[in-house]
């Protein structure tokens, strides 16, 4: 499956599915009432993916035909008080999602810290073309705002890995590492930008002034910055069946461990602990023999379903 990102839906794309990654922070006191109309619109138009609604706004990634996605974006943009979301389009040869979910949440991206409002205070946005100069500055601390399994398959040169498993762990990491950040320019990045909205707001709230984040995230950087000028190494994990993308947003050969959902490079699959659908080096010790036996049976059913031509995502 191929994929590429752009600011607008490309009418010349020969790929049948348009993928829209979007978010918008805005006061939405009526967010619960928005769920059903969104779900109905998506169902009626063959759109799949996930949309999260909360009192602080909307976040999600969805896929469908170009016309269907245009209808959805028009509907979202017309929601009173919301306005135009931060939006990135891509195209794919296969549907990258299995189903459609519209969920009500406390936060559209969960950090678990009360009072963080990106509408009031965030870091300075840095365009992809200016990012290299910032992170090459010896007075800049570069912080990968993603989780450890995302960092493991790709990151920027010199970036710190906070070794977090979830976004909720980031505030504690900052508090424990203040000495590494004091007196420095702090440059943060994440996949598409939304986690950095809250992360930079949080860090600024602790009294740090020189706080920056990559506008449009890694995806926009990989789209706009030529490979020969790039300071990115590896692949960028994405939260759908494409798994990861590289420079130019070309799909990579990274796959998912279907037992734990960690990304696996071809080298990872050479591990003695890797068994397709059952375990990988990252999760083998976390599972009991009973767990692995259950996963093995599930994998067997997946393979049987594939032979019958049934949905290939059974058990995934």
Curated annotation (Swiss-Prot):
Pfam families (UniProt xref): Rhodanese, UPF0176_N
Tagged with keyword tRNA processing: yes
PROSITE patterns per the UniProt record, alphabetical: RHODANESE_3
Annotated ranges, domain Rhodanese: 136-230
Catalytic activity: uridine(34) in tRNA + AH2 + O2 = 5-hydroxyuridine(34) in tRNA + A + H2O
GO biological process, one term: tRNA modification
SMART domains listed in its UniProt record: RHOD
Entry keywords, A to Z: Oxidoreductase, tRNA processing
Keyword presence, Amino-acid biosynthesis: no
EC number, UniProt record: 1.14.-.-
Family statement: Belongs to the TrhO family.
Entry protein name: tRNA uridine(34) hydroxylase
Gene name linked to the record: trhO
